[in-house]
């Protein structure tokens, strides 16, 4: 298989190339048995049962093969937001279907080859998320996406407070910028250092978006005095790191086979920090365990927030359930079907 060149802009890193086949050869020998989560998820059977209706609706607007990739979306939302009411659970499920559909659209090679169309779709996604009014005739190629999305974000805006709705839109914009960054590091562009990867992937993991939706799911709104507390901000950053590590571990095999290098495990290996993919997996699992310990310690050390303390505790609970729900879903999802050796995988 043809070698792919990866260039480094950092003075300590020399130009190098990597052989995708060499990475593929290591995949069957990887051991993930030491990969577990300290955080548990709940499960809302009512939300899970809504999946069929949500996907049937999506199938009216998108190709069958794209909708098929959304299998077990109900399971994801049911685990991450298990305390949501039926009404809010249905909205959350639709938002996740939208997010996965648009993410897959942005990943299509034919779209990436046409930079103008790629940017146009990104702008449209933001307009839809913000529930903005705009001349829909300017986007004839995305008419189905617009028709599908309008009811979702209209209902979300009606149910959410104005502050929470705008915070969601802001975090979604940050997420899309992360997606843009991910696209920029494909060969032959430079592969970033680990710290850059870590900070950007806090947005790219979707954790910050999910944490706003966690408030929505529990019908709370966390006051700025709580969210702005340094300890709470660090807690949210570490929780995003954890979600990012989980996504990287579970998606590793799929990303190697797809030629995607935006993965902490691959960054460690390609930078020469570890000598094998297994060593890189072990390093990320260790980083993950360390992050879990930091989160647990931080939760125990957070101060009381006076009259806002009950909301703060509910927020912490909602976020840890998001983490646990994401882990459990990733371990079972057919979306990562090539990663059959991962713990608890159905395949």
UniProtKB/Swiss-Prot annotation:
Mg(2+) 2 binds at residue 103. SUPFAM superfamilies: Terpenoid synthases. Mg(2+) 3 binds at residues 247, 251, 255. InterPro entries: Isoprenoid_synthase_dom_sf, Terpene_cyclase-like_2. The record marks 100 as: Plays a critical role in the stabilization of intermediate cation. Its cofactor is Mg(2+). One of its GO terms (molecular function) is terpene synthase activity. Its EC number is 4.2.3.-. Mg(2+) 1 binds at residue 103. Keywords: Lyase, Magnesium, Metal-binding. It comes from the Eukaryota. The keyword Flavoprotein does not apply. A motif (NSE motif) lies at residues 247-255. A motif (WxxxxxRY motif) lies at residues 329-336. Terpene synthase that may be involved in the production of volatile terpenoids. Does not show detectable terpene products with either farnesyl diphosphate (FPP) or geranyl diphosphate (GPP). P.polycephalum has a unique biology and these volatile terpenoids could function in internal communication of P.polycephalum, to mark the territory that have been explored, or they may be involved in chemotaxis. This is Terpene synthase 2. It comes from Physarum polycephalum.
